[in-house]
A protein has these predicted regions:
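Acidic catalytic loop of the alpha/beta-hydrolase fold
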Residues: 161, 184-189, 216-217
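Primarily recognizes the serine-hydrolase "nucleophile elbow" in alpha/beta-hydrolase
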Residues: 112-173
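Short beta-strand element of the alpha/beta-hydrolase
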Residues: 40-49
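Short beta-strand/loop motif that positions the catalytic acidic residue
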Residues: 174, 180-182, 186
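Short alpha-helix in the alpha/beta-hydrolase fold that links the catalytic acid
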Residues: 59-60, 142, 166-167, 176, ...
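Short amphipathic alpha-helix adjacent to the substrate-entry channel of hydrolases
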Residues: 56-77
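N-terminal cap/lid segment of alpha/beta-hydrolase-fold proteins
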Residues: 1-38
Length: 237
């Protein structure tokens, strides 16, 4: 992990951008941690949605809530064909980014490499995953193979889309506690497909949180409560 910016502190949260190499791919990311940080190793992995990136406003909000309110560090990396992985001035093409059969395996490898490097910097501790929409397309296959992830927040996704085959395989292998967010009037992911994905998750400790509204209309209060959920597992001594 190579730092690409100097640390910037705002309202008691330190932010630093980084890059790392994984299987010849450059992986751009950001780390957030409390200004007065130790090395307790508590870490959340933040996966952004399609057409977004590692610095999207809701990702920043989640990272800052975790650091400021719970003392938890977090990292985010740009997903396939998004953010700094694109050429300057280009817009993300969701279908093109996920067209290759190996896309899921590659982004899972990138996340595991980022976790390895983050633990060198932060120490080894409890790890959570937080990701909605495309973040769930990535997070479920990741949690299925990564035993360091002890709790996860998923949602806004179902057995639908370009990696649904991988989701069907991975979902039963996810055994950590899960909170799953579902927008009842989702115009992108059919409700029944989201319910099918929730039902398929192998975790014996899972909760479904449904809210009226369209795909991107998750209330900020629900977003904030999702960080409290992660902290309830990460902050147990």
């Amino acid at each position: 992990m190579k730092w690409t910016t100097k640390p910037v502190v705002s309202r008691k949260v330190e932010e630093t951008e980084f890059e790392l190499e994984c299987e010849s791919r450059t992986v751009p990311g950001i780390m957030w941690r409390p200004e007065k940080h130790g090395e307790n190793g508590k870490l959340a992995l933040l996966g952004h949605g399609g057409a977004h990136h590692k610095r999207s406003e809701y990702v920043l909000a989640v990272a800052r809530w975790l650091a400021r309110s719970h003392g938890i560090a977090s990292i985010a990396i740009d997903g396939p064909g998004h953010g700094a992985r694109l050429g300057e001035g280009l817009e993300p093409d969701f279908s093109e980014a996920w067209d290759a059969e190996e896309t899921t395996d590659n982004i899972v490898a990138d996340w595991r490499a980022a976790l390895d490097e983050a633990q060198v910097k932060l120490g080894v501790g409890t790890v959570a995953y937080w990701g909605l929409s495309m973040g769930t397309m990535i997070g479920i296959p990741l949690a299925a193979v990564e035993p360091r992830i002890k709790v996860a927040l998923f949602g806004l996704m179902g057995f639908w889309g370009l990696n649904q085959k991988q989701l069907r395989t991975a979902a039963p292998l996810v055994t950590c506690p899960v909170r799953f967010l579902l927008q009842w009037d989702d115009e992108i992911v059919p409700r029944e497909r989201g319910l099918m994905l929730f039902d398929a998750l192998g975790s014996k400790d899972k909760v479904l949180h449904a809210h009226m509204g369209l795909h991107s209309a998750v209330p900020m209060t629900t977003m904030r409560k999702s960080t409290v959920y992660l902290a309830s597992y990460l902050c147990v001594d």
